[in-house]
Amino acid sequence: MDWYLKVLKNYVGFRGRARRKEYWMFILVNIIFTFVLGLLDKMLGWQRAGGEGILTTIYGILVFLPWWAVQFRRLHDTDRSAWWALLFLIPFIGWLIIIVFNCQAGTPGENRFGPDPKLEP
């Protein structure tokens, strides 16, 4: 949960680097929250037919900016520009490439986007 909160606190931090653990823990908690909120939407009758419910929509809006920020920092950790995020516009293949990038280890030591986040206290 600490990793999730770290991302939320740095919700406009598009500079710097994000470790794999920071990124994937944020994604995992998002999946869990979205699932739970989806169940609540369904139980409360707040889910539109074939669409998102009220709670999941509000949650999605709230984490939209922090998700982009951590995605940019994750790309920076692999010494890639945030422009690589444009691959999200290419269905399936672009998404797969981004997943591969997000699974790769960050560059050891300092890179052009900042110091190694593993070495920071």
Curated annotation (Swiss-Prot):
Topological domains, Periplasmic: 1-23, 71-80
Entry keyword Transferase: no
Keyword Transmembrane listed: yes
InterPro entries (UniProt xref): DUF805
Any GO CC annotation of this UniProt entry: plasma membrane
Cytoplasmic side: 45-49, 102-121
Keywords noted in UniProt: Cell inner membrane, Cell membrane, Membrane, Transmembrane, Transmembrane helix
UniProt subcellular location: Cell inner membrane
Annotated TM spans: 24-44, 50-70, 81-101
Xref: Pfam families: DUF805
Protein's membrane topology: Multi-pass membrane protein
Top-level taxon of origin: Bacteria
Family named by the database record: To E.coli YhaI.
Protein name: Inner membrane protein YhaH
Gene (name only): yhaH
